[in-house]
């Protein structure tokens, strides 16, 4: 998948991402600066200052696209969209008629994302990941942790964002954090723990935790419309990117094959409701998910891409039966 070692790109993996029992361990994000409304962090929330590098296939990047849409920040934060599938040089930005939703990098002219990392730290060692948040004023990457980026987009751009909805309200934060921890470990990252496991035991441990949690979420969504409280919150937007990728990628490629999201009535209808929130459909690209995931050599060495994309998120949902 590729990494930078002392600023040099190498087509290899970080050895520490596999534990002693063969389990997948995700490396921590390395850039962790924070944008603040008042600029006290050194990075003030300003329209036109920040630029996102993303890929439609990546669920972590999808989080930031969701927040850019629901907070109506499209005019304030520019985006470069990578071509699906990790190339020899990693995430790549270019015009390609086969992928009309992908773009060159119009801010810096970087062809590969790793160029942004070495422009920020010439001796950088580690993974090169999306989303990556670039500050035009200082000319460097400031954050590549999706959970932190969406919090900034939610709370620090007041007066710049076109929508002031708070998806992390103070009264619900403790429960949102609890659900986030559960969903991240067993579902968001859980599908990767299944797909990238190197031993049968590691795979089965991740598989069992994944479906136990999906069963729990299915039951929870049978009692209430959203994961926390009576409104859409950060917890919902963090689960959604995994749900829309599950049936077209994780179910088969990552061997998460006990059942599909389509086989969970509550999760299915919940996913459709979130998809139908204004602005969200434009962030969902199922064909790109297929191409992106099935291009991962470690799980699909043949490189053959499935032809079909059998999903329809636009069908009507039944979530209005539950009180909001």
Task: Indicate where each model-derived feature is located.
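C-terminal alpha-helical interaction module
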Residues: 1-324
């Amino acid at each position: 998948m590729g990494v930078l070692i002392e600023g040099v790109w190498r087509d290899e993996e970080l050895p520490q991402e596999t534990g002693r029992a063969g389990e997948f361990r995700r490396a921590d994000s390395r850039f962790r600066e924070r944008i603040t409304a008042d600029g006290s962090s050194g990075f003030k929330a300003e329209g036109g200052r920040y630029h996102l590098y993303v890929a439609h296939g990546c669920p972590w990047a999808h989080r930031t696209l969701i927040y850019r849409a629901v907070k109506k920040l499209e005019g304030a934060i520019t985006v470069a969209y990578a071509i699906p599938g990790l190339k020899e040089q990693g995430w790549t930005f270019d015009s390609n008629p086969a992928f009309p939703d992908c773009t060159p990098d119009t801010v810096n002219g970087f062809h590969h994302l790793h160029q942004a990392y070495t422009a920020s730290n010439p001796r950088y060692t580690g993974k090169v990941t999306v989303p990556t948040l670039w500050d035009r004023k200082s000319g460097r990457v400031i954050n590549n942790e999706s959970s932190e980026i969406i919090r900034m987009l939610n709370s620090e751009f007041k007066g710049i964002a076109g929508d002031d909805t708070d998806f992390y309200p103070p009264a619900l934060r403790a429960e949102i954090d609890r659900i986030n921890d559960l969903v991240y470990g067993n579902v968001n990252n859980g599908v990767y723990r299944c797909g990238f496991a190197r031993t049968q035991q590691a795979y089965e441990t991740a598989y069992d935790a994944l479906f136990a949690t999906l069963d729990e979420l299915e039951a929870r969504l049978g009692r209430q419309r959203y994961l926390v409280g009576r409104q859409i919150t950060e917890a919902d937007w963090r689960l959604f990117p995994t749900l829309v990728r599950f049936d077209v990628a994780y179910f088969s490629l990552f061997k998460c094959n006990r059942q599909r999201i389509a086989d969970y009535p509550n999760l299915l209808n919940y996913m459709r409701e979130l998809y139908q929130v204004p602005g969200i459909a434009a962030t969902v690209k199922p064909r790109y998910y297929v191409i992106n995931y099935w291009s991962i050599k470690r799980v699909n060495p043949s490189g053959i891409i499935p032809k079909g994309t059998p999903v329809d998120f636009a069908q009507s949902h039944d979530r209005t039966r539950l009180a909001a």
